């Protein structure tokens, strides 16, 4: 009798809930499915390069020291020609083009330029790029040696003024290239790229107009290639959504005027706590695609990231910053490399010693030479603002499949883990035994540790193809790596 009364009460409660519109929802744990088909050759994009080998150094007169043990570090020499500032005043002693007041003539002196190049080489490093950025201070003089208002104009980074005499600048660059070829050999110089300008669009790097710079680039590249016809030349702009983004216009102008470039560099200094600067699909669309993915882009050119840092703060002058925490650095860089592999970008030029995201770098270093496969993403994260995705890679020579996944959030206080289902279709029959191991980035210890190898069996209904399915819980500000070895 008591059971009948209890059942009656339950039925009345349910009827009341429906009458008043009360709906019960059984909570279902959200899951993100990331997958690729390794059996479909159309998903294969490119062989993976290690993109953290280039290091910026400003006027390196005392050699170079780079701590990272990974890869083969190369150097980008910044401001090698002079035009530098010291304690807010022009430092003419570093110039390679000078004005002699007594004889009232211009002359070249490549002693400091040679010291920089020799210093890099003697330190055991190759040179990736020489930046032809700040003109020597003497280029603020007209052809008669006269200065406007009889004083030099000084910017944050030194001489940001366009040369007063473009013809003199052209002849000077020819002398620079002749000196380099005669001193180090043509073969060595063809391995180095020459970057005309630095972070153009920033008034403290180039005070002239956009049109003036385009003409400056044309004159400079022509002078370089007159001496070294197959020299690699290019330039460096701000990111596409910045206030003074000239990159898109430069690409269109180059196409219309048949002006050559082998590469374009772009700066990228995202604040780690701003969603519009850390969501990779959005960032690529507005900062890089507007340069690289337009019809006028030279198909054989490469897009590089000539300055990069994930930053926490920036000083008022805009020339110094504080790095984001290590956990954010490591998880973010995996997502950044996903963007690089997907869109065929190359080379992250770093300041410092390359120690901001070492755990991620080691994992990324281990997949160089392997093949990147594009993938799909389905489902929603438990926390809407978590940015989660994965990199799928095939090591053909060793019959190993790698998967790297990351979880990033622009909110430093985010704590929500995400539940992932990682799937990959392989060229093996169902029931094939594979060995699996994984490593998870520990943000407290800033390290990764590997699990033991575990045997799994592939699944599926096809005769010669099957799927490996892996479930993982991925903390925010972390990344993981799976290795799947076919026996």
UniProtKB/Swiss-Prot annotation:
Q: Where in the cell is it found?
A: Periplasm
Q: Which InterPro entries match?
A: GH39, GH39_cat, Glycoside_hydrolase_SF
- EC number(s) stated in the UniProt entry for this protein: 3.2.1.-
- Induction summary: By ulvan and rhamnose.
Gene3D superfamilies on file: Glycosidases
Q: Is the keyword RNA-binding in the record?
A: no
Class of enzymatic activity (EC top level): hydrolase
General function of this protein: Alpha-rhamnosidase involved in ulvan degradation. Ulvan is the main polysaccharide component of the Ulvales (green seaweed) cell wall. It is composed of disaccharide building blocks comprising 3-sulfated rhamnose (Rha3S) linked to D-glucuronic acid (GlcA), L-iduronic acid (IduA), or D-xylose (Xyl). Endo-acting alpha-1,4-L-rhamnosidase cleaves rhamnose sections interspersed between xylose residues within the polymer, degrading larger oligomers with consecutive Xyl-Rha3S units that are resistant to the ulvan lyases and producing dimers Xyl-Rha3S and Xyl2S-Rha3S as the smallest products.
Record-stated family: Belongs to the glycosyl hydrolase 39 family.
Name this protein carries in UniProt? Alpha-1,4-L-rhamnosidase
Q: Which organism is it from?
A: Formosa agariphila (strain DSM 15362 / KCTC 12365 / LMG 23005 / KMM 3901 / M-2Alg 35-1)
Q: What is the lineage of its organism?
A: Bacteria, Pseudomonadati, Bacteroidota, Flavobacteriia, Flavobacteriales
